[in-house]
Amino acid sequence: VYVPQGSDWSVTADTDLELAVCSAPGLGGGVPVRVIAPKDLGQEVRGKGTNTRYVTNILPEGKPADSLLVVEVITPGGHTSSYPPHKHDQDNLPAESYLEETYYHRLNPPQGFAFQRVYTDADRTGARSLDETMAIEDGDVVLVPKGYHPCAACHGYDLYYLNVMA
């Protein structure tokens, strides 16, 4: 369900559920409330070889969402995603757009782990303003304020992430 800024809403569940509330400051674009049905979700395969991953576009670029982009990605064990590395920290369309990004990670089986590196380009001295490599466990959230952000799923552990950008 897409709910624009300033709207009142609530959720009532009859069974246990895992609910993701993805939000960002809106631009006041007047986008109406709407149900995003499974038939409306675009699915695609990105990458080749060990860079193959499976993407479900929930709120993709080009669909009205008042500055919010949401995708789900499944990266099979032994594969990488958000790779080759790319970034969203400059307003330089069409090559790059300025976006902050979060990753909500799940693993199957859940006792597994993956890796994610968030880093910037090196300056003339070789220093980076951001360079963090994290062991990701089931349920972890990673904030990407700037820089590149590739993920690697270890063999035997499929990596799912909900990717939210604004």
Predicted features and spans:
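Extracellular structured ligand-interaction cores
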Residues: G6-D8, D16-L19, S67-E72, E100-T102, ...
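Short edge-strand/loop segments of extracellular domains
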Residues: P25-G28, H86, M165-A166
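Short helix/loop capping segments that flank catalytic or ligand/cofactor-binding pockets
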Residues: V11-A13, A20, G30-V31, Y83-P84, ...
